[in-house]
Amino acid sequence: MRSSLILFFLSATSFLFAQPSRVPEIQYQSVPDFLKLPPDLYLGEVAGVAVNSKRHVFVFSRGNSTGPAYGASAAQLLEFDADGRFLREIGHNLYAWSFAHTVKVDKEDNLWVTDKGSDMVIKFNREGRVAMVFGRKQEASDEGTAPLKHPKPPLPPVDGMFRQVTDVAWDAAGNTYISDGYINSRIAKVDKNGNWLKSWGEAGDQPGQFSTPHSIALDAAGNVYVADRGNRRIQVFDGDGKFLRQITIDVPVDPNARPAIGNKPNLSASDGPVTGNQTMAPGAPWAICITPPPNQVMYSSDGYPGRIYKLTLDGKVLGVLGESGKQLKQFGWIHEIACPSENEIYVGELLNWRVQKLILEPSH
């Protein structure tokens, strides 16, 4: 009898701990009409958003489009003050502008942008002048110039060159880590002077392999967090590329959740395990951001069901907010997150052509 009771207790205990704990809903507000645009200026898809030490907001938009529908040039970098008032455009008609991807601000308030179309990373100083250039776009006069062609298998990666580059981040020593990107499926590391140091990664789904490393961030210890979007995970490495761990975000989805665009993904368990590209799977990280020290947390966004997740750096989900949609406090494919503090974040949305400034209620 005693043995039976012990077995029953152990079984019940195992059952309890096997259940997913409820993730708290984070309460938040979106500042209405945050960005004040001049009458003749319009945003396109907002691919990037960043905030500097003065709380100035930088928006990397696929506005100012020129050229044909396919292969158009679509990139415009704009600066706003802390209250959202327009200040200036940076890099008007810049040679590297092709298809905006992300913008970041380093600890010295330099601006860094990645352009997926030109395969280039550009560093601007605080005055908005070009300070450093990485990569090179194809020459318009080359007979073989064909930016929309994807050779199969892809051509081997080349040091110092990128293919559809996605994001940048830095360590305390000033080394830059570049996620490269849709085709090369690797992380590159360059020193503070721009010298190429190393790269790691290749296409695949094993540790240290990537399916679109789409966003990148570093913590205060110098660990590198890579949003491996197509594999629905965040991989964590040391500064030399040694794999440390991976994080997956598994929060139940409301059966009534709607996609921001397109068909609703089929999440039926009867379909078997998800295979192949998981970009639209719940929890797949499109953008990640780590708050400043000393108490660092990470934010991650997905395309469906359009949520933002707040996590510890070891991957515990602390809370969740948002859903897909077109109204304030709803999201249409968050492509980049800026998180200057734990309870103030900025999101750039592709489908809604906007930036939202979100004020989160502190945890109790």
Segment roles from a protein language model:
Residues 4-15:
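Bacterial N-terminal signal peptides
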Residues 19-364:
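Eukaryotic scaffold repeat domains enriched in small/polar residues
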